[in-house]
């Protein structure tokens, strides 16, 4: 009886959040351990099914950095990063596209379809969904910055009940261009702005944004993010993630969340419990 009462209590705690978010569009950046660990992959698919069944419209943007780095290493191509962004040469661009669009994208799509969601895997090149230009004038090679998102493609899929699964590879400026590798955090942010998503959620391999003592900061305003960057509390690989959060919140997204994808059912814990699990970033 006590166990049943606990289940009822959990459902009642979730109800206000379910009512609040039903009908909303949410962009979910899927990466890290949640994308590699077999158990977490299965649970992520189940979480997306539940969101879908509750009337939430998820849009998934995935990364694939570890698989890309591993395959490049096997081929004798060194991976280089500056400020958390990959430098992409012409040879590695071909590998990036193969891994993101041909391997990971289809695996995620298959998982979701297997669990009863109508998922459609697409690349940013499909129907010119993402158009890009070189990042920092070409300093990062074929790593690009998104300059256009064709939101109507995503709208059309959502209206027909599909869950878009998007590989962050963008179209180049002219026919025959190999395309651009887009940081998945940046791609998720730009897509969230373009489709006017209610939330964007980043699954990572850390609890969220941590303070100087290593404790989780549960909520940050835009100005607090900048303060923590200036002081060096936010540093390294967390910088591109918080920058992506800041950009989408400035662009009209209500809140951005950075959560620990290593925790089972972290998406549900963040969205449907009063305590949450990660860091939310919002306007001042």
From Swiss-Prot:
Its EC number is 2.7.2.8. Pfam families: AA_kinase. One of its GO terms (molecular function) is ATP binding. One of its GO terms (biological process) is arginine biosynthetic process via ornithine. It is an enzyme of class 2 (transferase). Its main location: cytoplasm. InterPro entries: AceGlu_kinase-like_sf, AcgluKinase_fam, ArgB, Asp/Glu/Uridylate_kinase, Glu/AcGlu_kinase, NAGK-C. It catalyses: N-acetyl-L-glutamate + ATP = N-acetyl-L-glutamyl 5-phosphate + ADP. The record marks 29, 241 as: Transition state stabilizer. Keywords: Amino-acid biosynthesis, Arginine biosynthesis, ATP-binding, Cytoplasm, Kinase, Nucleotide-binding, Transferase. It is found in: Cytoplasm. Pathway: Amino-acid biosynthesis; L-arginine biosynthesis; N(2)-acetyl-L-ornithine from L-glutamate: step 2/4. Gene3D superfamilies: Acetylglutamate kinase-like. Belongs to the acetylglutamate kinase family. ArgB subfamily. Catalyzes the ATP-dependent phosphorylation of N-acetyl-L-glutamate. This is Acetylglutamate kinase. It comes from Wolinella succinogenes (strain ATCC 29543 / DSM 1740 / CCUG 13145 / JCM 31913 / LMG 7466 / NCTC 11488 / FDC 602W). The lineage of its organism: Bacteria, Pseudomonadati, Campylobacterota, Epsilonproteobacteria, Campylobacterales.
